[in-house]
Regions:
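Short, surface-exposed loop/turn microsegments at beta-strand edges and helix-strand junctions
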Residues: 22-29, 58-60, 77-88
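Non-catalytic DNA-recognition/assembly elements of restriction-modification systems
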Residues: 1-21, 25-27, 135, 140-185
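Glycine- and charge-enriched low-complexity intrinsically disordered segments
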Residues: 101-123
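A short beta-sheet element
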Residues: 67-108
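Short hydrophobic interaction/assembly module
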Residues: 51-74, 133
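Sequence-specific dsDNA recognition surfaces
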Residues: 4-20, 34-62
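A short glycine-rich beta-alpha junction/loop motif
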Residues: 84-87, 122-147
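Hydrophobic residues at beta-strand termini and immediately following loops
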Residues: 32, 92, 136
Length: 185
């Protein structure tokens, strides 16, 4: 196991401040905004916007790790290329030799939340900066171990997502039964 700062193993920069690039004659893009990054590594619910003339660095690449900069600092490892990342989201491009899935899971850990709290501002709505994200210290095993843990933790996240769908289905079923009772009156 070795201790490293995130900036030592990744390029880290902010997403696109897309409002400057809005253009009715531009190209349609799926834009990752704050609500797109969900707890437990889920990525969905994009904005569809017409944009023009911005740098390729703001397009997702497979293996990018995205982190919300406002609290609760949700994190996701990107599987789909070509999405546009908006501002207030840190794009973390992990170097070869490190597993992005594992790094994404590490960034959701309580030790990282504690570091962000200690490094961060004392505002009512906590927010972190790129400088603070670059200073985060991670304890990393060798690459093969990272891959194994990354796969295991991905499987656990998938199970959590499925379990939450079952809970939502059961809530809807309960509500439907109660509504039928009201309608039977």
């Amino acid at each position: 196991m070795k201790k490293v700062k995130l900036a030592e193993i990744a390029e880290i920069f902010s997403g696109l401040s897309y409002r400057r690039y809005l253009d009715d004659k531009g190209i349609d893009f799926h834009v990752i905004v704050q609500r797109s990054i969900k707890k437990d590594g889920e990525l969905s619910d994009f904005d569809n916007l017409k944009l023009s003339d911005f740098k390729d660095r703001y397009f997702t690449r497979k293996g990018d790790v995205l982190m919300k900069m406002p609290y609760p600092y949700d994190v996701v490892c990107v599987k789909e290329e070509g999405l546009v990342v908006s501002d207030r989201i840190a794009i973390i491009r992990v170097e070869k030799g490190y597993d992005p899935d594992f790094i994404a899971h590490m960034l959701t850990n309580a030790h990282i939340k504690k570091q962000l709290h200690e490094l961060g501002s004392s505002q009512k709505l906590p927010h972190t900066s790129l400088k603070e994200i670059k200073e985060l210290e991670l304890v990393l095993p060798d690459y093969d171990t990272q891959v194994k843990y990354g796969e295991l933790l991905n499987t656990i996240n998938e199970k959590i997502a499925e379990d939450l769908k079952v809970v939502e289905y059961d809530r809807n079923l309960k509500e439907g039964i109660l509504n039928q009772l009201w309608e039977a009156q």
